[in-house]
């Protein structure tokens, strides 16, 4: 328990002036106060100052003078870890810099997002309406101070969750990479054949720029619920939803086609959601830990990326299967070079006159 007297300046942001609060938060988040210059950190880690400067820039931080006391023990330990990885030959300096940039860009976006979420959670929706203010604007000083205090107080509990989520995603990414690179997987006759579909909200990034975090949360939740309802109604299986995209599979081409077209219709009729586009591919997939991998999955994703808003495009294999399925037609459109796939002839999926897909509930997706 803290030994300082309750109400001391370091305990509560309201006891500090606006100039003091950033320093307090920095000490709480980074540990010891910044006391070292770049040259001192470089020498402590056993690397040249130019190398330390490269990694500092890779993390996305501004340029500083050699003698500016901007660094803490945490900075020194981080640089030591990187230097050790490079020195032991585990990774090259180029790879280490690339991974640092990846961490930095993701972490910067995550930190900004979370500060906005916390500040918004402390802002009364009623007061926003009275003031006609978007909660994505700069919060008032009291809200900003309270948000800073809350983030600092829960940081130690959130940090393990961040590492856990990253390891989970890293596991999935490695599994997909290995599955995609294994020729035996694609030739394995025992691998199940599925229709894989990606549904993607069109112009999502520009759409959400006009929204508050609370509005964005409602939109994403609405999309996930509506997509899940449509997919499960036709006996499909939702693999995952990530923000503006949903991945689903089905064993039946007709049911998968009905899902795709119904998703387009459902989003078009919903006033909250932007239009959607869907890509379908038919082929063998690898299922691991509830996810699906392989060329068919990659193809469906690439097809979705080139599909016009409000339409459904399918690959050649799916078009061939639909040739013997009533209620749908696949109209050849054009050949496209898809990154990582090659040249693919795309077909637009449409309902045949008077036809609607039947809901198939075989539960085998």
Task: Please name every model-derived segment.
Residues 58, 62, 85, 164, ...:
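Conserved, well-folded catalytic cores of nucleic-acid-processing
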Residues 1-43, 47-182:
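Arg/Lys-rich, alpha-helical DNA-contact motif
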Residues 288-294:
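Short, surface-exposed loop/helix-turn segments at secondary-structure junctions
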């Amino acid at each position: 328990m803290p030994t300082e007297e309750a109400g001391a300046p370091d305990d509560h942001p309201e006891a500090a002036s606006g100039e003091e609060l950033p320093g307090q938060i920095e000490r709480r988040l980074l540990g010891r106060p910044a006391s070292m210059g770049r040259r001192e950190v470089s020498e402590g880690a056993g690397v040249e100052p130019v190398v330390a400067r490269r990694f500092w820039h890779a993390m996305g931080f501004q340029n500083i003078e050699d003698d500016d006391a901007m660094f803490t023990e945490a900075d020194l330990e981080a640089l030591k870890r990187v230097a050790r990885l490079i020195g032991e030959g585990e990774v090259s300096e180029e790879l280490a810099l690339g991974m640092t940039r990846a961490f930095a860009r993701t972490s910067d976006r995550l930190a900004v997002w979370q500060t906005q979420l916390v500040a918004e959670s402390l802002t009364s929706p009623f007061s926003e309406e009275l003031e006609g203010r978007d909660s994505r604007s700069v919060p008032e000083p009291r809200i900003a101070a309270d948000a800073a205090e809350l983030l600092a107080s829960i940081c130690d509990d959130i940090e393990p969750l961040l590492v856990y989520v990253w390891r989970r995603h890293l596991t999935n990414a490695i599994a997909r990479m290995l599955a995609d690179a294994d020729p035996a997987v694609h030739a394995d006759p025992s691998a199940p054949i599925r229709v894989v579909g990606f549904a993607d909200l069109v112009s999502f990034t520009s759409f959400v720029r006009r929204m508050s975090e609370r509005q964005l949360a409602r939109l994403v939740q609405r999309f996930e619920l509506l997509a899940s309802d449509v997919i499960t109604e036709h006996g499909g299986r939702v693999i995952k939803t990530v923000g503006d995209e949903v991945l689903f599979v089905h064993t039946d081409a007709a049911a998968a086609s009905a899902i795709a077209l119904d998703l387009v219709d459902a989003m078009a009729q919903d006033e909250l959601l932007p239009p959607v586009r869907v890509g379908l591919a038919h082929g063998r997939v690898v299922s691991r830990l509830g996810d699906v991998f392989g060329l068919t999955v990659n193809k469906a994703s690439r097809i979705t990326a080139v599909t016009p808003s409000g339409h459904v495009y399918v690959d050649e294999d799916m078009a061939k299967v639909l040739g013997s399925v009533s209620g749908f037609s696949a109209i050849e459109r054009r050949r496209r070079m898809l990154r990582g796939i090659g040249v693919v002839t795309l077909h637009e999926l449409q309902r045949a006159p008077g036809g609607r897909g039947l809901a198939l509930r075989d539960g085998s997706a």
